[in-house]
């Protein structure tokens, strides 16, 4: 098995256990309830994005049953994000310690996608889809910045194209930003002479 897959599986199991401790959002949750809460958590993270500059909403999210709308669980989004970041920094595994928040979230990309599919029918989309809807076309649930954790081989060609085009656009944007920063720093150095 690939080392990257092993690490993703370890992150998946370890983070579920970490969030399952007493007074945490997954405590006592199993099966379909556990999956629905994870889908909600990672869909909400995907909506805002995993940049270090992202300020997550400090509000309680209730996860409700699809059948009878009973509350299955609830969590504070900002607190859960802080717990995930604490998991990363306090892990005894040096490979997990070195991961970015985005890389930790990649292990839960399928849950994010599943949650985003449900939200799509309620008119809720990720910030990435909102800024580039032409790239997402019919698959807005694939437009999030940790979609690298999705298995491209179980997608159709149109879905693969959405992910490829989105990641290409993000790379172009990052490259343009770094070029502008380099130009600005050379201008400011010239002024100091």
Swiss-Prot record:
The keyword Heme does not apply. The N-terminus is blocked. Its main location: virion. Keywords: Capsid protein, Helical capsid protein, Virion. InterPro entries: Coat_protein_tricho/vitivirus (IPR008879). The keyword Repeat does not apply. It comes from the Viruses. GO terms for cellular component: helical viral capsid. It is found in: Virion. This is Capsid protein. It comes from Apple chlorotic leaf spot virus (isolate plum P863) (ACLSV).
């Amino acid at each position: 098995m690939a080392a990257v897959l092993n690490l993703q599986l370890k992150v998946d199991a370890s983070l579920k256990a970490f969030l399952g401790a007493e007074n945490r959002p997954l405590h006592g949750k199993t099966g379909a309830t556990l999956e629905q809460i994870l889908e909600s958590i990672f869909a909400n993270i995907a909506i805002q994005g995993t940049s270090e500059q992202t300020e997550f909403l400090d509000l309680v999210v209730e996860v409700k049953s699809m059948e009878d709308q009973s509350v299955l669980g609830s969590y504070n989004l900002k607190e859960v994000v802080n717990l995930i970041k604490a998991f990363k920094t306090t892990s005894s595994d040096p490979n997990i310690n070195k991961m970015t928040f985005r890389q930790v979230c990649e292990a839960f990309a399928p849950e994010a996608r599943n949650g985003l599919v449900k939200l799509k029918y309620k008119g809720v989309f990720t910030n990435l889809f909102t800024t580039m809807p032409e790239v997402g076309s019919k698959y807005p649930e694939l437009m999030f910045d940790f979609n690298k954790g999705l298995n491209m081989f179980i997608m159709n060609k149109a879905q693969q194209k959405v992910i490829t085009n989105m990641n290409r656009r993000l790379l172009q944007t990052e490259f343009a930003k770094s070029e502008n920063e380099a130009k600005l720093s050379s201008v400011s150095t010239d002024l100091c002479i």
